[in-house]
Amino acid sequence: MAAAAASRGVGAKLGLREIRIHLCQRSPGSQGVRDFIEKRYVELKKANPDLPILIRECSDVQPKLWARYAFGQETNVPLNNFSADQVTRALENVLSGKA
């Protein structure tokens, strides 16, 4: 799982500085992201206490996963209509450098 991958320091080797998750509080397209946060955020944060993991809610925003690396480099992955499991896989890909 993403928490296990991050706890092995995989993201740290890539210079990962921060994870941000943007989502809408109400839209159906963000439901999987809301489910992911509800079910897996605590485990992920416990496995990565030094990595900032920010949750940003905003009305009518398209859900996205943002990763900020060293030197200000950023990547993002659209999460629209993803299930919680698909969000987990997207996060694992970011942590392993495949995103």
Curated annotation (Swiss-Prot):
Membrane topology label: Peripheral membrane protein
Keywords per UniProt: Acetylation, Disulfide bond, Electron transport, Membrane, Mitochondrion, Mitochondrion inner membrane, Primary mitochondrial disease, Respiratory chain, Transport
Any one GO biological process: proton motive force-driven mitochondrial ATP synthesis
Q: Any S-S bridges, and between which cysteines?
A: 24-58
Keyword Signal in annotation: no
Q: What molecular function terms (GO) are annotated for this protein? A: NADH dehydrogenase (ubiquinone) activity
PTM annotation (N6-succinyllysine): residues: 64
InterPro entries on file:
NADH_Ub_cplx-1_asu_su-2, Ribosomal_mL43/mS25/NADH_DH, Thioredoxin-like_sf
Modified residue annotations for N-acetylalanine: 2
Q: Which SMART domains match?
A: L51_S25_CI-B8
**Main location, first listed in the record:** mitochondrion
Where does the record place it?
Mitochondrion inner membrane
Residues carrying N6-acetyllysine: 64
Origin superkingdom: Eukaryota
Q: Which Pfam families does the entry mention? A: L51_S25_CI-B8
> Which spans of this chain does the record mark as coiled coil?
none
Can you cite an annotated GO cellular component? mitochondrial membrane
What is known about what this protein does?
A: Accessory subunit of the mitochondrial membrane respiratory chain NADH dehydrogenase (Complex I), that is believed not to be involved in catalysis. Complex I functions in the transfer of electrons from NADH to the respiratory chain. The immediate electron acceptor for the enzyme is believed to be ubiquinone.
The subunit field of the Swiss-Prot or TrEMBL record says: Complex I is composed of 45 different subunits.
Q: What disease is this protein tied to? A: Mitochondrial complex I deficiency, nuclear type 13: A form of mitochondrial complex I deficiency, the most common biochemical signature of mitochondrial disorders, a group of highly heterogeneous conditions characterized by defective oxidative phosphorylation, which collectively affects 1 in 5-10000 live births. Clinical disorders have variable severity, ranging from lethal neonatal disease to adult-onset neurodegenerative disorders.
Q: Which family does it belong to?
A: Belongs to the complex I NDUFA2 subunit family.
Q: What is this protein called?
A: NADH dehydrogenase [ubiquinone] 1 alpha subcomplex subunit 2
**Organism annotation:** Homo sapiens
Query: What is the primary gene name for this protein?
Result: NDUFA2
